[in-house]
């Protein structure tokens, strides 16, 4: 089950529903609720009730380290006790991603890194730097 937890980007929920439909995965959302922590807790309860064994919570993207949003993502972690936390980064972000990855890892102790847009012309320097700084695997 995919969970639409990005309440900040206007089209995020609809976009996740389209993706879920395209790949045949159920998407849970609550368009009336603007509290990502509450959304995550309700979605986990729904997933358990329906017998899902995998839940992916899509949260708001954070291009820079914003303390309020960092606290929010930590609250989601504490509320749902995930088995795995992945730091997803646009491979075209460059070296700025290293500082963001370090801040996220310090706050969340994530399990690995997922790089998007690798089909572009980036050379992967940020990936190697992130791997070195946070000492977490790059997931494929």
What would you call each of these model-derived segments?
Residues 1-140:
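P-loop/Walker A NTP-binding module and the surrounding RecA-like catalytic core of P-loop NTPases
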């Amino acid at each position: 089950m995919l969970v639409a937890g990005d309440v900040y980007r206007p089209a995020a929920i609809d976009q996740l529903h389209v993706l879920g439909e395209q790949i045949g995965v159920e998407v849970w959302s609550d368009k009336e609720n603007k509290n990502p922590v509450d959304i995550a807790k309700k979605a986990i309860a729904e997933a358990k009730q329906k017998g899902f064994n995998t839940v992916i919570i899509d949260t708001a993207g954070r291009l820079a380290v914003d303390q309020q949003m960092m606290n929010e993502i930590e609250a989601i972690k504490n509320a749902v006790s995930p088995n795995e936390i992945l730091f997803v980064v646009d491979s075209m972000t460059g070296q700025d991603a290293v500082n963001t990855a370090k801040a996220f890892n310090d706050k969340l102790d994530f399990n690995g890194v997922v790089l998007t847009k690798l089909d572009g012309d980036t050379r992967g320097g940020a990936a190697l730097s992130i791997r070195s700084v946070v000492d977490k695997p790059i997931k494929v």
